[in-house]
Amino acid sequence: MNNDKRFEGLWNAIAEKRYKHFITYAVDQESVWLLANKDGFATMDVDGYIHLLVWPSKEFADAYSDAYSKEDTPVEMDIHEFCERCEELMDDKEIRFMVFPTGKDVWIVSTEGLLSDLTEELERVE
């Protein structure tokens, strides 16, 4: 499968499939991608929650930024550092994660849920 077909297939997949891909790919690559700007990490405030947006690779973060958030730049974070930062956010119930958003739909998960899934996958492969 060439990269364009792979990209399109994942970009157009349902949110749950993209979430599962995010977990396995981020752990395999040992990194996650977020968007950042001069004020810090890009967030979306929806329904009283602050959502951090994350992707499994730069190409998807770039595509989202190009389409919806031109002032934000993709930044890579080591998976272990990301997990540590998630642990620091555990008590803040207003923070959630939008995992692999594409503009059409998104998988929203609590910090605890995301950290649990990433930790489980890390334990499985390490």
Stretch-by-stretch model annotation:
Residues 1-126:
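Conserved NAD+-utilizing ADP-ribose enzyme module
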